[in-house]
């Protein structure tokens, strides 16, 4: 089969909803994690379940919050018919939760899960985003392209949310600046209690773009939230962990201002080439072991080739607009995937 890649973006401009959001199509999963959103006052977040298969899927939603894990009735035995999607308000699963993490388990057929997040602060829209899923908990997370832009008075402008689902552990958080001339902040240790989400303020560093790496002694899930500000015209993004990209594949860059492909190196240097599928000059760069680079790109489909494992994401940063989505390797051997609108 021929590998496929697709991505989309949207800008909301209304009295009660603003912001830029972008996301990529990816294969459905039997299990996934949604790290992001809230169910407190001002948040209007929706869990979206799509079934591109030919048989019904039955989905169980578990929510991790300040009191541990819960299995709310509104998230039990949710049937998603083939070729359709189902939307579940996050507040209907666990009301008043500041740092929820949702585990999605599907039987009968895999589903694609995502989180539509939007925020209002005292009647002032604070942005919107589409939160990408994680396939599984892992003892090592790499989150490329996080933009640290601002801090408000008494408010954190960039926050890492972590959860260790199964065991108490300690996570080490390292921030790697994309600007090679910038000094990296000191790594930080974060104790995690099993089943309880934990937030870490990352905004006390120099403004700029970073790759956030998390290592722990037990599997964890995590994502980073960042905002352009706390006033009129603000937007935010949730940055999800990216899986390893170890060979070649096609990727899609959705339309948007300030787009770049951010590549985080692994344990060895990697030469990365982006080649426009519809023609054009390839872009080749070397990313050092443990380093990160940003490759400015326009909208389109590209072939990504690398000679060593890397992690990558598409990141957008412009005035009043933030968005990001991780790049997953295309599985050319997988069965056909139908993309739902």
Residue ranges and their predicted role:
Residues 1-8, 261, 272-274, 304, ...:
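Long, low-hydrophobicity ectodomains and other hydrophilic envelope-associated domains
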Residues 218, 268-269, 276-286, 291-293, ...:
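C-terminal beta-sandwich/jelly-roll accessory domains of carbohydrate-active enzymes
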Residues 1-19, 48, 52-57, 79-126, ...:
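Hydrophobic, ordered structural segments
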Residues 49-70, 106-107, 154-181, 216, ...:
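Short acidic, flexible loop segments centered on an aromatic residue
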Residues 68-101, 181-209, 277-301:
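Intrinsically disordered, low-complexity Pro/Gly/Ser/Thr-rich segments with frequent PxxP/GP/PP motifs
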Residues 31-40, 54-80, 88, 139-150:
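Intrinsically disordered, low-complexity linker/loop segments enriched in Gly/Pro
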């Amino acid at each position: 089969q021929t590998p496929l890649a697709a991505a989309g973006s949207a800008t909301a401009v209304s009295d009660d909803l603003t912001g830029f959001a972008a996301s990529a199509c990816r294969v459905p999963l039997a299990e996934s994690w949604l790290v992001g959103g809230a169910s407190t006052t001002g948040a209007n977040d929706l869990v979206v379940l799509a079934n591109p298969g030919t048989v019904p899927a039955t989905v169980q939603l578990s929510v991790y919050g300040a009191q541990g894990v819960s299995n709310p009735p509104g998230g039990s035995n949710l049937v998603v018919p083939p070729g359709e999607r189902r939307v579940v308000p996050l507040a209907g699963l666990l009301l008043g939760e500041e740092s929820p993490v949702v585990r999605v388990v599907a039987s009968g057929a895999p589903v694609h899960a995502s989180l539509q997040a939007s925020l209002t602060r005292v009647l002032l829209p604070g942005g919107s985003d589409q939160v990408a899923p994680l396939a599984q908990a892992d003892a090592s997370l790499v989150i490329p392209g996080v933009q640290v832009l601002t801090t408000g008075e008494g408010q954190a402008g960039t926050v890492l949310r972590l959860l260790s689902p199964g065991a108490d552990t300690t996570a080490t958080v390292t921030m790697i600046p994309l600007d090679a001339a910038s000094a990296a902040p000191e790594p930080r240790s974060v104790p995690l209690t099993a089943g309880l989400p934990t937030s870490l303020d990352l905004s006390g560093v120099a403004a700029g773009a970073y790759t956030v790496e998390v290592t722990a002694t037990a599997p964890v899930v995590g994502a980073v939230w960042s905002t352009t500000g706390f006033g009129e015209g603000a937007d935010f993004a949730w940055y999800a962990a990216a899986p390893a990209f170890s060979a070649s594949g096609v990727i899609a860059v959705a339309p948007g201002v300030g787009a770049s492909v951010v590549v985080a190196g692994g344990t060895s240097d990697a030469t990365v080439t982006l080649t426009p599928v519809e023609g054009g000059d390839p872009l080749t760069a070397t990313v050092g072991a443990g380093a990160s680079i940003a490759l400015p790109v326009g909208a389109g489909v590209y072939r990504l080739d690398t000679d060593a494992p890397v992690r990558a994401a598409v990141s957008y940063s412009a005035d009043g607009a933030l968005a990001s989505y991780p790049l997953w390797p295309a599985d050319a051997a997988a069965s056909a995937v139908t993309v739902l609108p």
